[in-house]
């Protein structure tokens, strides 16, 4: 995936050194965009092996509207554990905003169910948007993630903030706006997750595949990832794999892990790097 390596190289070569919330420090740029034609293959990074199981289970967890880590840990996915309470709670994070956005009358709005119906019935609408950015529920930076959850707020603010679908020539495209992007550890997950989500929505709405467009706000490399970045940039991308989805599934909320099969995934060895909390 040349697009991903180009992003990494661009930030390494032109970015500005900045302090950050974690105290690690970053090299950062503001504003960058990548585009992937989903008809050309599934955009899973090949210059290091990625853990697809975690990507799929996390996406299904979002779509379930869940905000407790139980489903994830039951399926061997621990990527959210550092921020959860002892009970596994994360507060009103992505799943809650996608499926249960709070309304002024004390009720909730299922953004995703409405989105799918709107794409089916009004494909040319410019309102195919889902937002996870709810200012009233953002965490207090001076409080631990766990205490924020106890206060009824998110453990972490959403990094992948807002996404929009677009229909043209019977093809479905998706654009993600990501306000904050950990390029080495997080972005490969984000690309694959939203590419897969686009494929799922296309299937249940009867559309063909268009593009996944990934737009960044603060795109950064952590300073303690720079050695790993050099290792990855020295590797040649391999051919993209193919993602097969069970064609029988017609309801966006009915997908299961077993409905996905990655075919012909060739990748260079995994590269370990510390996560900044």
Swiss-Prot record:
Family: Belongs to the thymidylate synthase family. Bacterial-type ThyA subfamily.
Annotated source species: Saccharophagus degradans (strain 2-40 / ATCC 43961 / DSM 17024)
One GO CC annotation: cytosol
Pfam families, per the entry: Thymidylat_synt
Binding site for dUMP: 21, 126-127, 179-182, 190, 220-222
GO terms (BP aspect): dTMP biosynthetic process; dTTP biosynthetic process; methylation
Protein name as it appears in the record: Thymidylate synthase
Catalyzed chemical reaction(s): dUMP + (6R)-5,10-methylene-5,6,7,8-tetrahydrofolate = 7,8-dihydrofolate + dTMP
């Amino acid at each position: 995936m040349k697009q991903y390596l180009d992003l990494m190289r661009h930030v390494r070569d032109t970015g500005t050194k900045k302090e950050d919330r974690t105290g690690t420090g970053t090299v950062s740029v503001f504003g960058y965009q990548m585009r992937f034609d989903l008809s050309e293959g599934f955009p899973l990074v090949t210059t290091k092996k990625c853990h697809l199981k975690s990507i799929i289970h996390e996406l299904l967890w979002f779509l379930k509207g869940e905000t407790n880590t139980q489903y994830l840990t039951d399926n061997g996915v621990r990527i959210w554990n550092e921020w959860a309470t002892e009970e596994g709670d994360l507060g009103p994070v992505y799943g809650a905003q996608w499926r249960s956005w709070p309304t002024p009358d004390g009720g909730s709005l299922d953004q995703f169910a409405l989105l799918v119906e709107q794409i089916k019935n009004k494909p040319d609408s410019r309102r195919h948007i889902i937002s996870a950015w709810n200012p009233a529920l953002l965490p207090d930076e001076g409080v631990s993630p766990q205490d924020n959850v106890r206060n009824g707020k998110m453990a972490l603010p959403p990094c992948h903030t807002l996404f929009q679908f677009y229909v043209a020539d019977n093809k479905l495209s998706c654009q993600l706006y990501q306000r904050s992007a950990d390029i080495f550890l997080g972005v490969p997950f984000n690309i694959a997750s939203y590419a897969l989500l686009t494929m799922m929505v296309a299937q249940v709405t009867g559309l063909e595949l268009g593009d996944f467009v990934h737009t960044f706000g603060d795109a950064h490399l952590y300073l303690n990832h720079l050695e790993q970045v050099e290792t990855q940039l020295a590797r040649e991308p391999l051919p993209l794999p193919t993602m097969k989805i069970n064609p029988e599934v017609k309801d966006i909320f009915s997908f299961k892990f077993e409905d996905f099969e990655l075919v012909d995934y060739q990748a260079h060895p995994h590269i370990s790097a510390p996560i900044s909390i």
